[in-house]
Amino acid sequence: MKPAADKITLIGAGLNGPLLAILLARRGFAVEIFERRPDMRRVRMSAGRSINLAVSTRGIYALQQAGLWEGMRNIIIPMRGRMMHSIAGELTFQPYGKNEAEVINSISRAELNIALMNAAEEHGATIHFNQRCTGYDLKSGAIRVRNEGTGEETTREAEVVIGCDGSASAIRGEMLRLSRFNFSQQYLDYGYKELTIPAGSHGEHVLETHALHIWPRGNHMLIALPNIDGTFACILFLPFEGTDSFAGLTTQVQVIQFFESRFPDAVPLMPQLANNYLANPTGAMVTIKCSPWHVEGRALLLGDAVHAIVPFFGQGLNCGFEDCTCLLDLLDRHGADWARVFREFENERKVNTDAIADMAIENFTEMRDRVADARFLFRKKVELALEAKYPGFFVPKYAMVTFHRIPYSVALARGKVQELMLAELSESINRIEDIDWGKADRLIRRDLTPLEIRQ
């Protein structure tokens, strides 16, 4: 049977599911979403993963396409750069971009999720909560759903299914049964734990508001993102095992002693530190790659279900949202020829999602180890000087990823070339004034072509 062109079933109402539902509904499709969790608008619950997210150009573009970005401005906080906290309590600010327009935006996962679900329903999508997808028959086009409250199992017709159901995707689980389905997952040896810096006595932020705060300490790191209520959402990254690890911090005394020795300026700001640490779960971080992403024109995987990445480039949300806009671009181009749309979607996206997965792991090392290194910081200044002198040719990798919609694979490839240039141009100098601009010009003209900028 040919898949129906007017009705789409989405699995998962996290972030990608509701956004995709809006984009599809705006084009006249009937959309149903099945979500295993209760409705977070009516039941107090954890967001499940990190409590704050970073929205940048790719995510903003997707929200604009859904007609939602302007309405989001009251729940975001622009972050203009990184505020580094040394172990001595000294602060160093590192701007993200070449000007104040290049910012990333902190947003509550729960607030964003609620806004997306509200908008999806306003556009006519139906969301079924407490309905866990337990399987999908790729031949008959039927999903199996279990009511999480009653345990009742039902079968629903679903001719076209898109799995937006995260790194533990049930739809991917069905695809794993297929011959020649490739799948890999790689966990970091590090975990994370959510903590909180409360607002001040008058509801104010007790640290600089418009910055991502980082306490880099080599093999461990604390970060803090601002919330609109004056609090900061903090995340501690530690190895699971070994010295200075989650395994070694199991009592209030151990936690306080560890923080006082590693993050002394943060301790006075966290009156419930030990209690929060011991009460909150320790999360794991995984990179998932697989192929194919689709089964003919019947089923497709999208977002974390097909390319989960670690959070250190702030691109998880942005990459997933870009999946949605890419899929809709192809749908606009080819109509409901789902087999062709799904095939071209994978061809276009996989090389790019593989690239951001690799860059996210690389950025972990940078955030954890290198952001406090003087030579690294000087090279960042050289990088900005090159961008200013050669606009359209030299764009820092971070900017290509974060402030433009340049394909991730292009950012990765050009980033490697530019890294070699930076090493050569910054070697043996300590001042921007000492850059050999003649050499820079020769390298730029030889190794870089003009870059197509998409913002």
Where do the model's predicted regions map?
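Conserved FAD-binding catalytic core of PHBH/FMO-like flavoproteins
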Residues: 118, 122, 131-135, 140-285, ...
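Active-site-adjacent segment of FAD-dependent monooxygenases/related oxidoreductases
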Residues: 44-119
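Glycine-rich FAD pyrophosphate-binding loop
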Residues: 25-48
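Short phosphate-binding/catalytic loops that engage adenosine nucleotides
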Residues: 29, 68, 125
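Conserved mid-domain beta->alpha element of the FAD-binding
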Residues: 11-26, 163, 195, 281-372, ...
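Residues at the starts of beta-strands that form the adenosine-phosphate
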Residues: 7, 30, 317
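C-terminal helical "tail/cap" subdomain of flavin- and related membrane-associated enzymes
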Residues: 2-6, 329-455
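Conserved Rossmann-like nucleotide-cofactor binding loop
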Residues: 16, 39, 168
